[in-house]
Amino acid sequence: MKIYFKTFGCRTNIYDSEVMKNSLKNHEICDDETKADVIVVNSCTVTNGADSDVRNYINKANKNGKKVFLTGCGAISRGKELFDNGKVFGVFGSSKKENITEIIEKNIKFIDLGDINKSQNSIVKNFKKYTKAFVKIQEGCDFNCSYCIIPSVRGHARSKDESIILKEVLNLANNGFSEIVLTGTNIGSYGKDTRTSLSKLLKKLSQINGIKRIRLGSLEPSQIDDEFKELLNEKWLEKHLHIALQHTSETMLKIMRRRNKAFKDIELFNELASKGYALGTDFIVGHPGESDKIWLEALNNFKNFPLTHLHAFVYSPRDNTHSATLKIDVDGKTAKERLKTLQDIVEQNNFEFRKKHYNELNVLVEQKNGDFFTGFDEYYNKIYIKSDKDLTHNWIKVKKYEIEKRGNFTNF
């Protein structure tokens, strides 16, 4: 049979889809969903909107006569509903992904969610269509923020065995991958359950021959400890960190049941910026409790953060979370205006950062889009490159370039 894998959501899901592709036997992986016999939907459920996207995709696949299997976070939150409504042939949990061949060969409809707290030690040897490799180092989260459903669908925080991670990255390096991205539900919690730490793991990964750059997924402010700070001058560590704030009002952080404190966060971000780091964050606009007064407090604080990258979005209630039981204080129009305000601030910050840090850039070229090759530098800024050579998958040093609002531009 021809199998198509449709992946929604985060880097963790990208990794899990690659595990399934690497585990599939006796069937053909298809890159064209219209020609597939079977579609495996690796779903995201972080918002109600994400659920809708998955549901709409499945409805379309059904209309086209495809046999559909559902996995990922949505299998836990919406799997039974979709199964009972006859939308999917089978539903299986993330812990079952290595059994993908057996699963798609089933002739009887089924639900098998497995154990969401199972330790998973999968190894991916190759990432087709990617210039960098994603490496999942842990699963689950113990933070239980008021707006988030992920702990209930990904389980408690548990670390992947260090020896398996090292073996996996060695295999990837031997297969030509020189940049890795560490991913997971909450990667900063790595090692808490195994008497080690993310910093210790990073030191060992950096010693693997062939690895030039290590990028990190999202960290929490409390996870940037002294041990981690000792690594900040290492050349192999990406000069960009994504640290989840979610908000910059002390009151809102309490309502959200967050562990971070706004004024401590400002101190941390300024310390990291002084080391030359580009800094990104997440921000939820319009969460219940965000009054005009609280918004102004948050905005004033936000302006004091040296942010260069931003993943911000307007709050939408997520079923089965505490926040969904609270009254929304902000209308949609106002929330979008607040979102635009934050985006404009960070866009200008990023522009000024690139002008201030006009250095030689190390770029891994990922692909060609139109007239330009594109890739990302160590600050996680996109660069557009004109060249007569095929630069795809190559590292290049960029010494001269033009800085524009939308990115950096060069000829090579």
Please place each PLM-identified region on the residue numbering:
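Proteins enriched for Cys/Gly/acidic motifs involved in redox and nucleic-acid/cofactor modification
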Residues: 1-189, 226-227, 241, 262-270, ...
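Active-site proximal loops enriched in glycine and acidic residues that flank catalytic Cys/His/Asp
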Residues: 7, 184, 218, 245-247, ...
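Residue-level signal for inorganic ion chemistry
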Residues: 40, 73, 100, 182, ...
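Conserved SAM/AdoMet-binding glycine-rich loop
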Residues: 68-72, 77-78, 82, 174-292
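Short acidic, glycine/proline-rich loop/turn micro-motifs
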Residues: 253-256, 322-326
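Contiguous mid-protein beta-loop-alpha structural module that forms a pocket-lining wall or clamp
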Residues: 290, 306-307
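Short, acidic/polar
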Residues: 293-299
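Terminal RNA-binding accessory module
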Residues: 325-412
